[in-house]
Amino acid sequence: DRVGGAIAEIAGEAFELGPIAQGPGKIAKVTAKVRILDPRVTREVGELITFGIRIPLEIDMVVDLRIDKPKFMVFGEISLRATAQAAEPLLLILDVEKPRPSDISIHVTSKSLRAEVVRIVGGVDAEIKRFIAAHVAGEIDSPASKKAKIIDVAEQVAESWGT
């Protein structure tokens, strides 16, 4: 639970991107509203304690082409790995690997044939993965994230014992 809470802090909740100029001559302007859902964490105990992390997300995206504004709905999941390292006195430090675009799976839908053509010709799926990977990598390095990756076990034991 503590690791899941730390990962949720690192992942954040919702954010907006854009408008970001894309395509030939940077003619297209992309905006997106991203919702981060509750992460699912599975623990694997071996020589090291590692965690498989799956962070579901939903994105409402608009590509403004000046003559048309196709809208897309994206459902996806970010797959991360983390390793827990013990530190003195009673700290648990999470080392979260930064995602690559290949660690992100998405399903993109739209309501028009024109939007589907824009999606295919413009390589929209690959761009979405690239932007998400870059954003999450930035979040992993953020000051708030660095703080969230340190779990004070002694403090939590004291709280549970009421001392």
Model-derived features: positions:
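Extended, low-charge, aliphatic-rich alpha-helical segments
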Residues: 1-2, 6-7, 115-163
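Short secondary-structure boundary motifs at beta->alpha junctions and helix caps
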Residues: 104-118
